[in-house]
Amino acid sequence: MRFFLVAGLLFISSAGLAQTITISGLARDRATREPLPFASVSILGKSIGTVTNLNGEFDFHLPAEYRNEILVISMLGYANFEAPVWSVMSSTGQPRVFELDKSPTLLQEVIVADTLSGGDILRIALSRIEENYPMKPFLLDGFYRDTKKVGGTYISLLEAAVRIYDDDYREPRNRFRLRERVKLIEVRQSLGYENKFTQYFDQDNLLEDLLLQNNIRYRQFKNDDDFLKSVKRERDTHYNGHPIFVVTHQENFHLKVYIDKRNYAIIHLETETGPTGEIVTRRKGMYSTFDGLKKTIDFRQYQGKMYINYMTVTSRINWYDSRTEQLNFETELYQELLINKVTPDTQERIASTEKMKNYGLQYQDRPYNKEFWANYNVIKETPLDRKILADLEKQIPLEQQFEN
């Protein structure tokens, strides 16, 4: 990807003997100057990475020994940017602005009537999951966050550094039982988990629920003929220097899947469902209905296999008065998982005694480790995050809430 570098920032921090390089930047479209959210930021051939936030911004912490490695920024529809880490170093004190050019339109992007249909492409992709995804044990280091909102006001925040072990991407016998083993490295939360409205959210382990939403890992795709016939092929795009199939489904729910033309690996998917009207639960003279779900899952290739890169899920539940059927309040749960390190073919396991429990992470927190979080790859805050902070800090600063 060709970038125009406007200004830059890169500094080295020391914690004991360990040195960390931090690259701060902004990725945006060169022509429109619009930010590019969830672009992948990584080191070529290495297992670490992060993603840009909704404003295209990122802070990428990496070992100082990587200064001679190649920084890579990838985005669907754009050509890759690659440059040595040392070459983007600057002491100006300002984040670097990366202006990205879209990939040129190719003749192959024109869909010909006698080529593969969208359903054909998706069918092949689903049949090749075990070829394209890891079939040996692996570890993922990641950052998890969830926020809860009631009537437009954020009431709680929870963040965790996690380690995830999985045997492989073999199709599970039970798609509703978590196969991964998760170890909690650090957990921090706001005091909002004591808010009276938290009882109107699921009290189970929400990270476990999120992992079970991985459509590829848990084979959560319809694959009958009627469904596949409804899948449409869209104009091809580009990612990581090669062409990508794009297929969509619009009946009853929205689905958009990006599939690598070289090997039919699913690299990205987006899905959204609307209100169903079905009653979810009843409580204290009220009942709740499902108001919709929006999900994004992104994968990144490492050593020839696809590993989850990031995942976001937004789910909405509305609560009504049982007697009058009037809307009392709306709730929204937002969850995100960023994978910042992959360890393939691992010999390390997560023991049963180390596994997170199946109840809520808010009950599994531990003393706040400020030094750890200072150099940990999280998703950079946005103005939306600052709205979250404003809501949560009405009593005391969030940092103090973490410490408490």
Summary of predicted features, one role per range:
Residues 39-43, 56, 71, 112:
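Hydrophobic beta-strand segments
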Residues 72-83:
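A short, solvent-exposed loop/turn motif at the edges and junctions
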Residues 47-57:
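Short, acidic Ser/Thr/Gly-rich low-complexity loop/linker segments typical of extracellular
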Residues 1-26, 41, 107, 403-404:
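Bacterial Sec-dependent N-terminal signal peptides
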Residues 33, 60-68:
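Short Pro-Gly-centered beta-turn/loop motif in secreted/extracellular proteins
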Residues 22-36:
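Structural motif
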Residues 82, 96-230, 237-242, 286-404:
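Surface-exposed, low-complexity/disordered segments
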Residues 216-271:
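Extended beta-strand-rich segments in extracellular/periplasmic secretory proteins, especially
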